[in-house]
Regions:
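Ser/Thr/Pro-rich, charge-biased intrinsically disordered regulatory regions
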Residues: 1-93, 111
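Extended amphipathic alpha-helical regions
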Residues: 71-204
Length: 204
């Protein structure tokens, strides 16, 4: 009934309390993910590039026209929460998105982008990769630097292992392709499952 009058995902503060991590675990509340983050919003498909941080979208019915990402201030989940934990099967890192007033769509995109572009791969992480993948990461990193994606690109020809960015690890899978629940994977990876843990899918 409310949906016909006001979109329940509209930006704003009129959503009741924001659940902290403790509230969420005590209540064991199931979270409803914003349809745009699930990739199930009919009118808008999010295009989010993890290398550049650019966000936009398109309507599946009219793919030739770009649509601005106007939903960035909408809540990422209902009920709203202070923290989302995001992992992906394509990298070893865990991204924690935090906002005391409730995590928004913009928080999700900006935090993921910063986590992957402002943090470097450690030498130990790099050395865990098979030689073939190390070579691919090195090539991707050089391409990203040539494109001027990283500040200081001109100072490094071939970056040292600790200069590779986390986004380089993803190789060609640099486009956000939705979040989903996968409790079995979360438990295997983190040792526990929780309502606010989501798996990020990526595409090339």
């Amino acid at each position: 009934m409310g949906d016909s009058a006001v979109n329940k995902w509209s930006a704003g503060m009129s959503y009741g309390p924001v659940l902290s991590q403790t509230d969420l675990y005590l209540l064991n509340t199931e979270l409803q993910l914003n349809p745009i983050l699930q990739g199930t919003s009919g009118g808008f498909h999010l295009l989010f590039n993890l290398v550049t941080g650019s966000t936009g979208g398109f309507n599946a019915e009219a793919r030739d026209r770009d649509i601005p990402f106007t939903a960035k201030d909408e809540p990422a989940t209902l009920p709203r929460v202070t923290d989302l934990i995001i992992i992906t099967e394509l990298s070893p890192w865990c991204t924690i998105v935090h906002n005391d007033r409730g995590v928004t769509m913009s928080d999700v995109c900006s935090t993921i982008w910063k986590e992957y572009t402002e943090n470097c791969i450690t030498e130990a992480e790099y050395n865990c990769l098979p030689a073939r993948l190390q070579e691919q990461v090195k090539r991707v990193s050089q391409n990203n630097q040539t494109a001027g994606s990283w500040p200081g690109a001109m100072y490094y020809g071939t970056p040292a292992p600790n200069r590779y960015k986390r986004v380089d690890w993803l190789r060609d899978k640099i486009f956000f392709d939705g979040l989903q629940k996968k409790d079995t994977y979360a438990s295997a990876r983190l040792g526990f499952k929780a309502p606010n843990i989501f798996i990020m899918n990526l595409a090339s």
